Design a protein with these regions (language model features):
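Active-site hotspot residues in diverse enzymes, especially metal/ion-binding acidic/histidine motifs
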Residues: 1-210
Length: 210
């Protein structure tokens, strides 16, 4: 297997699926993905148990096609996981079962699913166009840049995913934005506390015993 060619083909597939289902921006929601799942005949099984290293799995057997998702995942990880499993639907159905955990995360099939998901949620071409429009030159992308980009596009690609993309495309030096921790804190510094988070904190404060 030519890995680079395989990954490039998956990016092309991601673009085709986006176009087929009318996705034209960097914001791909769970609702969008559920709609695609429904058209593809994929059932969703929300698993109530917590897994330390497993977010989802794809099953294709005599009962049909099912994607198991860890219930309660936040919006960004849920969207990425659903897009990840969608790659297995298109390319790996003959395997019967596809899942990603620490034992196989470096295998081409799973890396390919990550490549597909990142391109599906925020295509490289759109990422480049947005950064160019923001006046960000090669090697000059900072954590602040990515916070502004996420705010502008409302993408469901996580900060970690955006950081990987920024370094791979040359907008940030290697091991700079991917090494950054504290995305939510930086987001709050730049844009203020999310009102829902503020309300939740206020409620918790009122509920504390004297």
């Amino acid at each position: 297997m030519n890995r680079n060619g395989y990954y490039d083909d998956l990016k092309i597939l991601a673009a085709q699926v986006r176009a087929e289902h009318g996705l034209h921006s960097a914001r791909v929601t769970r609702t969008d993905l559920r709609r695609i799942y429904s058209k593809c005949g994929i059932q969703i099984d929300l698993w109530p148990y917590k897994f330390k290293n497993l977010r989802g799995a794809f099953f294709c057997d005599e009962l049909g096609m099912t994607v198991m998702l860890a219930k309660g995942l936040p919006e960004d990880p849920m969207a990425f996981t659903m897009a990840h499993e969608l790659k297995h639907y298109f390319k790996d159905r003959e395997l019967g079962l596809s899942y990603c955990d620490l034992s196989n995360e470096d295998k081409p099939l799973e890396v390919g699913a990550e490549v597909f998901a990142a391109e599906f949620l925020f295509p490289d071409a759109d990422f480049i166009a947005h950064l160019n429009a923001m006046g960000v030159s090669v090697g000059r992308c900072s954590p602040e840049t990515l916070v502004h980009l996420k705010r502008e596009t409302r993408t469901t690609l996580s900060y970690a995913g955006m950081a990987i993309k920024a370094e791979r495309l040359g907008f940030a030096p290697r091991d700079t934005v991917t090494a950054f921790k504290g995305w939510k804190k930086l987001e709050e510094q730049l844009y203020g506390v999310n009102p829902w988070k503020a309300r939740a904190a206020s409620r918790r404060g009122r509920q504390r015993p004297n």
